[in-house]
């Protein structure tokens, strides 16, 4: 797995470096124009095909583990399903997990696509500035925004996990573990902090300049950030404790060992 990730990172780093060196504005389409000028337009098609294969591999990996992961979350009480569905969790195929994940993804995609395409006001998008394409430009920039915030949240988790390991391990097996670990924590913390502070600064500048579109865009951006932080870091233990107390009270109300009150 580590070897595969390393190869993918190397390939995408080479693509990003090529785009930066061959185009004045850093746009991927500019690389295609440069290759056409050099009579290498076919290579741009091959490059797009390889990117599509990489995306298909990511989707395939996601589909392979999402069902089992969802079912493990259901078993631990992190996700809710009807009691009858819990009887099917131990079957070889994770059907319950796939259905649950599919419903969540469809609802989330519809909600976020509607919000991004109808309400988000991005900067000028040269690729979608024609009549009828404004919603698509808004949706693409909003999708990029969601991907950015999700990546920030993932890096925050990685930094917290690494910080927890540094605090828990008293005598590491390798002498360089603490140095490299603290360096990684500092770099992750500073970079993600800059990304999270930027929209607040942009909102202040937009308010000062009385730019309505930028005020709306940055407000939505900050709202999405707050929602993601709440979803990822909100403690679920108080909710579990409250549900458990209600369950105990229901069992006491109908008598001990009451099968009708026992939930799977």
Curated annotation (Swiss-Prot):
InterPro entries, A to Z: AA/rel_permease1
Entry GO MF terms: transmembrane transporter activity
Main location: membrane
Keywords from the named record: Cell membrane, Membrane, Transmembrane, Transmembrane helix
GO-annotated cellular components: plasma membrane
Membrane listed as a keyword: yes
Disulphides: none
UniProt topology in membrane: Multi-pass membrane protein
Bilayer-crossing regions: 1-21, 43-63, 95-115, 146-166, 181-201, 215-235
Subcellular location: Cell membrane
Secretion signal, residue range per the UniProt entry: none
Family according to the record: To M.pneumoniae MPN_308 C-terminal region.
Name used for this protein in its record: Uncharacterized protein MPN_096
Species whose genome carries this gene: Mycoplasma pneumoniae (strain ATCC 29342 / M129 / Subtype 1)
Top-level taxonomy: Bacteria, Bacillati, Mycoplasmatota, Mycoplasmoidales, Mycoplasmoidaceae
